[in-house]
């Protein structure tokens, strides 16, 4: 009995050590931003985005608290084979008070298996909800290739000259499928699937690589239900991206072409089972970030996007912007962001334009333009001149001449745009990723 009692503390100590080691192996990653701001004419901070543009210049122009909290762990490993469990809980609130009710969203819940197929060394197998190989422009928070969602796939298959990835993901619409239930017309959500194939790591020149992608999206109505007449049932997206290393940074040049339902979000997610989005989209994009030396760094973007819809409800969007950074010390810097957006309506022929300039003093954890966490104080000036906008559901109620989601010119009776105005905002913000 005494021998058993002496062994018990030793067993408990070993178990505690094992549990502690496992707990320390949990990966905690994430992103967050939050702050406080005011508008020169009074009230809380306003944020500025050109009507018809898909994004806005974000420095000193974010009016919400947003966070992504990621927990993950390698739960099994044997040799070079392993399983990794990954999660991501995200939320967004308007940062107006201490307690703000919010329903968090599980953006990611997936398992990734590495080297599980003997004849495909280095390949990863995965299933679940996932941020899948997203491509974005950070300074305008613009995701131009993003099929994230529930799905499954096989990635990083080494072909010798490049790496092949294949996946299927899903992003469904709230309605769009019509049928009859008990002899009454019934509308149900429509499943939208995207089938994605990518070939990456193609070496074209010293320091330069090419990635090619093909995405096919389709609406998948359940048995006994069909899509609305004229709805966009499917579409394609073709992407070519060249990445060039420059000093300690990079430049990315992107060409994209989309058809029909893939012109709805223009990022690889198809949509349109409830609307007619048949047509085509062409995008030419160049963006990058470079740390030139210990004093200077810069982000930049220039893009042309043309959406030509069969229903004449497309648009042409130009945007160009820069964000130079001067580093006073390894942890203190000054940033100036200047951006211009111009959006022409295919239906009205008129343009909406906006200039936005932000000056920020920043303290960050390091001397790179990517160093975070950062605390910044900022002042923003925006000026816009708009002549058209999209009708809302409330606009269309009781007015048979208007259709929600359709572009219209401003008139003396109704204003759809923000008009012609300017504004100043100022405040403080923190931003972190880890």
Swiss-Prot record:
Major localization class: membrane
Gene Ontology terms describing biological process: monoatomic ion transport
Reactions catalysed according to its record: beta-maltose(in) = beta-maltose(out)
Highest taxon listed in the record's lineage: Bacteria
InterPro entries in the record: G_neg_Bact_CarbUptk_Porin, Maltoporin, Porin_LamB, Porin_LamB_sf
Site (Greasy slide, important in sugar transport): 31, 66, 99, 250, 370, 433
GO annotation, cellular component aspect: cell outer membrane; pore complex
Entry keyword set: Cell outer membrane, Ion transport, Membrane, Porin, Signal, Sugar transport, Transmembrane, Transmembrane beta strand, Transport
Ranges in a coiled coil: none
PANTHER family according to UniProt: CRYPTIC OUTER MEMBRANE PORIN BGLH-RELATED
Protein known as: Maltoporin
Annotated organism of origin: Serratia proteamaculans (strain 568)
């Amino acid at each position: 009995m005494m021998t058993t009692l002496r062994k018990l503390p030793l067993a408990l100590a070993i178990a505690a050590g094992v549990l502690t080691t496992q707990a320390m192996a949990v990966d905690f990653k994430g992103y967050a931003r939050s702050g406080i701001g005011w508008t020169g004419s009074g009230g809380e901070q306003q944020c500025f985005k050109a009507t018809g543009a898909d994004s806005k210049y974000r420095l000193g122009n974010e009016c919400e608290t947003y966070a992504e909290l990621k927990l993950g762990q390698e739960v099994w490993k044997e040799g070079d084979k392993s399983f990794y469990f990954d999660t991501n809980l995200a939320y967004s609130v308007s940062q107006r008070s201490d307690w703000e009710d919010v329903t968090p969203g599980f953006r990611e819940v997936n398992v990734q298996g590495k080297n599980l197929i003997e004849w495909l060394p280095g390949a990863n197998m995965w299933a679940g909800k996932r941020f899948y190989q997203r491509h974005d422009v950070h300074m305008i928070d613009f995701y131009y290739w993003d099929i994230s969602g529930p799905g499954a796939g096989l990635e990083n298959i080494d072909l010798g000259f490049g790496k092949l990835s294949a996946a299927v993901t899903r992003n469904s619409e709230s309605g769009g499928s019509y049928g009859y239930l008990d002899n009454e017309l019934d509308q149900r959500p429509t499943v939208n699937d995207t089938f994605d194939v990518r070939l990456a790591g193609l070496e074209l020149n010293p320091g330069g690589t090419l990635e090619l992608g093909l995405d096919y999206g389709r609406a998948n109505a359940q048995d006994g239900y069909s899509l609305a007449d004229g709805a966009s049932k499917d579409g394609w997206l073709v992407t070519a991206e060249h990445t060039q290393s420059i000093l300690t940074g990079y430049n990315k040049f992107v060409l994209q072409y989309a058809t029909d339902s893939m012109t709805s979000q223009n990022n690889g997610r198809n949509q349109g089972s409830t609307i007619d989005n048949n047509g085509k989209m062409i995008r030419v994009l160049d963006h990058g970030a470079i740390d030139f030396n210990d004093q200077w760094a810069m982000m930049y973007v220039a893009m042309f996007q043309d959406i030509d819809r069969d229903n004449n409800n497309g648009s042409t969007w130009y945007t160009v912007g820069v964000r130079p950074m001067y580093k006073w010390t390894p942890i203190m810097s000054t940033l100036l962001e200047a951006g211009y957006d111009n959006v022409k309506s295919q239906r009205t022929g008129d343009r909406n334009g906006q200039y936005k300039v932000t000056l920020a003093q920043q303290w960050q954890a390091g001397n790179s333009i990517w160093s975070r966490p950062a605390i910044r104080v900022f002042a923003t000036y925006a000026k816009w001149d708009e002549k058209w906008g999209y009708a809302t559901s409330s606009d269309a109620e009781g007015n048979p001449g208007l259709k929600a989601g359709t572009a219209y010119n401003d008139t003396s009776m109704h204003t759809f745009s923000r008009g012609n105005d300017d504004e100043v905002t100022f405040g403080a913000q923190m931003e972190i990723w880890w």
